Regions:
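Short beta-strands and strand-loop turn motifs
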Residues: 87-91, 120, 206-208, 264-267
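Fold-level recognition of mixed alpha/beta catalytic cores in primary-metabolism enzymes, strongest
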Residues: 22, 26, 32, 132, ...
């Protein structure tokens, strides 16, 4: 490097570095804090092929939450990119096989506090980096309508298991479509919430400006109900959130009159869709119009570059979070 150091300088630097290394040694001896785990649980088991015919499950367990709450009587699956204390978590990848979190993600704690019952971890794509359903190291997750086809990804298991009725609801994750795509392909309701509405604390990051957790269910009401439970500030644990904000009762808003509501359809969004998908969206828009809403096409030219922009952000973010960091 072209540096010239005298023996005296080297001695000073060596003494300085030695002190720094002692600090690292001390840190390695410290016992890290452990978060309390509120509800009794056992580790569960890896399901046999007969227990997971679509390969939708990564791990089966049975964790009962509070005796009463908004989710009382509801069964829920958690995408395997989200931590559940004491339950193995692989995130679809051989890299994490054998890892067992010691904490519950915030959304998991909220579900249990609301009386939900967790039945297991749902399979997802390898590090959540695929929109289809064939990259999980345990094998592909099959589409419940046609087992020769993909269930979509990366929240593949969540969508497939919700459709079959093995669970009432599921938590999915979405960066560039990972809730919406499998929900569409399996025929359920999936929502990517407003950025920062649902805390991401305790889930594997890909890119902090793209990461979302959201609800998946067989109908809009249950999707809204789960969103009510998991939304809200997380005590500054998620830096993307405001310190305080109001969470509406979304289930009550389902009864809101549509008269006077303004809804925009992005015209560029239809350019890459198959015709039958376009038809379904337009039929839905017509139903909203009949209910009194004003539905209009709106042009956002930059939307055409959305895939390119999202891919670049996602790849660089994934490199920083997954390869340079520890994904948490």
């Amino acid at each position: 490097m072209g540096l010239q150091c005298s023996d005296v300088d080297l001695g000073v630097y060596q003494e300085y570095i030695t002190g720094t290394l002692r600090g690292y040694d001390r840190i390695s001896q410290l016992v890290g804090p452990s978060l309390p785990v509120k509800y009794p649980r056992t580790p569960g088991h890896r399901p046999s092929p007969d227990e997971s015919t679509l390969n939708g499950w990564y791990w089966k367990c049975d964790i009962k939450g509070a005796d009463d709450g908004k989710l009382s009587g509801k069964t829920i699956g958690i995408k395997d990119s989200v931590a559940v204390a004491g339950v193995p978590m692989m995130n679809g990848s051989k890299l994490l096989e054998g890892y067992v979190p010691e904490f519950d993600a915030t959304v998991v704690s909220r579900i249990l506090d609301a009386g939900g019952r967790l039945l297991g971890k749902t399979n997802c794509e390898d590090l959540c980096c695929c929109f289809s359903s064939f990259t999980n190291v345990t094998g592909p997750t099959l589409n419940p309508h046609d087992r020769t086809r993909s269930s979509g990804g990366s929240s593949s298991g969540s969508a497939a298991l919700v459709f079959t009725g093995e669970i009432d609801m599921a938590i999915g994750g979405d960066q560039g479509g990972s809730i919406r795509i499998p929900a569409s392909w399996c025929g359920i309701v999936g929502l990517k919430p407003t950025f920062g509405l649902v805390p991401y604390t305790g889930a594997c990051f890909i890119e902090v400006t793209l990461d979302h957790l959201g609800p998946m269910a067989r109908n809009v009401h249950d999707c809204a109900l789960l969103l009510e439970v998991i939304s809200g500030p997380d005590g500054n644990n998620d830096s993307r959130q405001s310190s305080s904000f109001h969470v509406p009762e979304y289930t009550k808003q389902l009864q809101t009159e549509m008269t006077g509501k303004k809804i925009a359809l992005i015209t560029e969004g239809f350019a890459c869709c198959e015709q039958n998908v376009q038809d379904v969206v337009k039929e839905t828009a017509l139903k909203l119009t009949i209910k009194g809403a004003l539905v209009e096409g709106v042009s956002i030219p930059l939307h055409k570059d959305g895939n390119a922009i999202c891919s670049a952000i996602g790849l660089e973010g994934a490199y920083n979070c997954l390869y340079k960091g520890n994904a948490f």
